[in-house]
From Swiss-Prot:
Pfam families: TBP. This is TATA-box-binding protein. Sequence repeats lie at residues 3-78, 94-176. Keywords: DNA-binding, Repeat, Transcription, Transcription regulation. Belongs to the TBP family. GO terms for molecular function: DNA binding; DNA-binding transcription factor activity. One of its GO terms (biological process) is DNA-templated transcription initiation. General factor that plays a role in the activation of archaeal genes transcribed by RNA polymerase. Binds specifically to the TATA box promoter element which lies close to the position of transcription initiation. The gene is tbp. InterPro entries: TBP, TBP_CS, TBP_dom_sf. It comes from the Archaea.
Length: 185
């Protein structure tokens, strides 16, 4: 399993003059297109969307450390370069973690959909191969969505912690194997 993206919302606790800061920070700001300043932190590997209210969204991180480094850098840049005054410590909340998974064996999506319909741990299943080649499996706990593909590849989305995709993979593997389908490879 590999984490592909972590998205976090942040309250920086201070108003930001986006017109001024976009020039100083060399960010992208086109208020008629989008109300936030797009600030790329290429050395960290994240993109930050900064809003006038001091709210911010950080995306592109592969781990929490990158989120916190990004928040620290943005606060420092806004404070030192743009003169923004902050009122307290930033509040960071993970909104979504996306992970990719490889089961290393082809998945029989028709059978998986059939056997997991009505399972107590499954909130919902969508599988319409004419519309989309993957099976969408929504779990109750952890509350995530898994996209399973015939190739054995999968994507987990909606996680709030790094452990949730691992728990989801384990739970799905156990359920599938319980019904006699093999996932070892």
């Amino acid at each position: 399993m590999e984490i592909q993206n972590i998205v976090a919302s942040v309250d920086l606790k201070g108003e930001v003059n986006l017109d001024e800061c976009s020039v100083i920070l060399q960010g992208e700001y086109e208020p008629e297109q989008f109300p936030g300043l797009v600030y790329r932190l290429e050395d960290i590997g994240t993109v930050v969307l900064i809003f006038r209210s001091g709210k911010m969204v950080c995306t592109g991180a592969k781990n929490r450390e990158q989120i916190y480094k990004s928040v620290e850098r943005v606060r420092e840049d806004l404070e030192k370069k743009c003169g923004v005054k902050f009122h307290g410590e930033p509040e960071v909340e993970i909104q979504n973690i996306v992970a990719s998974i490889d089961f290393h064996v082809p998945l029989d999506l028709d059978t998986i959909a059939e056997v997991l319909v009505g399972d107590e741990d499954v909130e919902g299943i969508e599988y319409e191969p004419e519309q989309f080649p993957g099976l969408v499996l929504r779990l109750r706990e952890p509350k995530v969505a898994m996209l399973l593909f015939y190739s054995g590849k999968a994507v987990c989305t909606g996680a709030k912690t790094e452990e949730e995709p691992e728990k989801a993979v384990k739970k799905i593997a156990e359920k599938i194997e319980k019904y006699g389908l093999k996932l070892t490879g």
